[in-house]
From Swiss-Prot:
Residues 654-721 form the S1 motif domain. GO terms for molecular function: 3'-5'-RNA exonuclease activity; magnesium ion binding; polyribonucleotide nucleotidyltransferase activity; RNA binding. It is found in: Cytoplasm. Its cofactor is Mg(2+). Coiled coil: none annotated. It catalyses: RNA(n+1) + phosphate = RNA(n) + a ribonucleoside 5'-diphosphate. The gene is pnp. Gene3D superfamilies: GHMP Kinase, N-terminal domain, K Homology domain, type 1, Nucleic acid-binding proteins. Mg(2+) binds at D511, D517. It comes from Sulfurimonas denitrificans (strain ATCC 33889 / DSM 1251). One of its GO terms (biological process) is RNA processing. The keyword Zinc does not apply. Keywords: Cytoplasm, Magnesium, Metal-binding, Nucleotidyltransferase, RNA-binding, Transferase. This is Polyribonucleotide nucleotidyltransferase.
Amino acid sequence: MKYDIKIDLKNKNEEYSFGEVAKQANGAAWLKSGNTVILATVVIDETEIVKDDFLPLTVQYIEKAYAAGKIPGGFFKRETKASDFETLTSRIVDRSLRPLFPKGFGHPTQITIMVFSVDKESDLQVLALNAASAALYVSDIDINKSVSAIRVAKIDGELILNPTLSELDKSTLDLYLSGTKEDLLMIEMRSKGGIKVDTNLMIDPLMDPTLSSAIIATHVSNAVPEDELITILAKAEELLFETNAMYEEMFKEFKKETSPLECKAHALNEEMLKYVRSNHYSDIKSAMNQMAKSERSTALRQLRKKIIITKEEWDEVELKDVIESVKKEQVRGQILNDRVRADGRALNEIRPISISTNVLPSAHASCLFTRGQTQALVVLTMGGPKDAQMFENLTDEGTQNENFMVHYNFPGFSVGEASPIMGTKRRELGHGNLAKRALEPIVNLEGQTVRLVSEILESNGSSSMATVCGGYMALRAADIETSDTIAGIAMGMVSEGDKYAILSDIMGLEDHDGDLDFKVTGSKDGITAMQMDIKLGGISLNILKEALYQAKEGRAHIINIMQEAEKNISFNDGVLPSTDFFHINPSFIGDIIGQAGKTIREIIEKFEVAIDIDKKDGKVKVTGKSKSGVQAAREHIEGIVSTPKMPKIEYKVGDIHKGIVKKIVEFGAFIELPDGVDGLLHISKISDQRVEKVSDILKEGEEINVEILEFKGNKISLGIA
């Protein structure tokens, strides 16, 4: 393959070939980075224009199994349904490129990104966007800006730009941002929870007295404070702008001549506009008071029909655009000029919140979280390691297990639409992934699997953030330990020139007519996840900083309400499985297990629990169907550990010891020696005379003198002394 351009970037290089392959496409770019090879193509349907007010853009990111020397698993040996990673990558590319298209562009456009070869250390999401942007830039569409992506990691406090996958795996931060040479367009960020060693923790006397990190370690979310995040974004933004300027300079000689594509006319009918403003301004304002999307749409539709009756010659589609424009003008003007929103709230005001936990008696845990006209029923189910979701990405060496899942469902009835419930849509997958990224850093699920399902019962904006809040409450309603209290809030913005207003807890109307969709999740002290999409072409870091701090205030308000609701949680003890973790001094492990596992079996049977002990650091995991059983088992184990250890006796052949008859069997009796070790007194060694029945001579609980006759491994043979 002949490469036209080689670009050296921070921690990586990229080679591009244009015009060698996929020549029938409107634009194509062949990208090689390391051993990764990606082809991105852009194709436009020049014969059709979609008249509706949206951009008919479709992005498909497709991974080929042969790229990693693999054959697809399962019954069918070919690539079929897109994986979650492929779908999420398609969404990232779509959201980054969509703002570039000219206003009024209505031609159906397909961007296809195919991975033909893969390097195990390559960041495929970054390369996918870079390849797609290159294909779009050199195409014959009137787009003159390059978009690219940068990922940022943090290891031991040090920032790494464009990390390898190995570095990203060790990082406490995963920040992905895209933009042009002038503006940020999209941000995705998450913190990654981990173990923090605190040498100031007091050591439990029952634990190993040595300062083992496993014993004094605590789980932390690594949430990122707002000031630190702004500093990181500033560094990444600088490199992003430089990189895009370089791309544009190097790609421009390969750009095709712009095709004279027809765009939708976006100039409004002045006659209609004047008439609607003069005669129906108050009707539109009244419709805006209908907060539900279905009610608002019905009111505007009825207004349209009312006008058409008297203005039969008018085109209804044009009238719809005019009414929509006046509505948008009203919403934005009221916010910018009066600093009041359509529902009467102040710019930073949060809608009323109500929280009910464990509303489903047979579920392990649940929460009904309502904020304004947005309502999420979040249900939690606990399982073991075998319940984890198995998956294998193209860059993985083998099968991976996902033990924390968040599934988001958005049925049509939640917005008053008569539509059947079908398969999972891209938006549902994306919202579930955002909620997962928000909550995953605060839980440590060793040996457990947790599935959260969010059923959106009503939606008027911010349903993904309701999922985060409801998801946290469901975790607490299941008595799962968390390192932070996490809430989510959706921020918005309306701007006109230098004038702007930042909105907290946006509803659907403000999302639709605003310039920014910015979702932020975290604790009172920092951010665990965020997702930002710009609709106006870019955002400055100063405005972003203001939005982050306003979001922090909103989160604190929501967290206060959630913490009050936590006090009233009543657990579903009848169905809720329980797990407890604690540490013991590893030297006591033998006492807990007992000879041939006798002691631990007795604990398991008595308290109906499962017990797992790490022999290296003494970590004990107790799992059972009831919390009371788990607690009783823990207390029993701690009782064994707290009992002073008897000095270990070195038994020698010929030694005489006192022992207790523990159990009588047909072939003899088991005798408990002074340090708790059992030895076998065979029937032939009980007397010089023939013994027909052991119980004729010995009684259980009787104390006798015995002689050590023989050692065989851990087995001790005894005789009557």
